[in-house]
Amino acid sequence: MKVILASQNQHKLVELSAILSQLGFEIALESEYGLHVDVDETGTTFEENSLLKAEAVMKASGMPVLADDSGLMVDALDGAPGVYSARYGHKSSDAERIAYLLENLKDVPAERRTAKFVCVITCLWPDGRRIVARGECPGQILFAPKGTGGFGYDPVFYLPELEKTYAELAPEEKNAIYL
């Protein structure tokens, strides 16, 4: 089944395609259909933002749509950056956002650096069917980046049970967490 990913993010396309192609889904960025739908993420939850994106792209395309909203929630920062993860501290690059996060956590000891990655996926079909799923992965924030893979906050998000950051995981290892 062909599905449009409501995103311009190539990293998301690669990760989601690796998982969903096994289930018979053929995922493509909206740009591959000549679309560039700019959605103001005005929601206060990952669910709201995911739905906003899915509805806008489905309205523009008339095709089944997959949208996600995801982010990092750090307990010592009362859940920040949360839904603002991609624009945390008004920084434009992953490295700048990581530096800003680490600066905000500089006085927080290791045992209080608990966090979780949250991902909400919304699937909409033109016939009105809707599926919304939420996943959470607990971990800790390191004092410095480690690893070269992934994107976003992956280099500082540490999984104690695997003794690796997301950025140190092979794509297959990371995808296994999601399934």
Predicted regions mapped to residue ranges:
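Anionic-ligand binding patches
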Residues: 2-4, 11-179
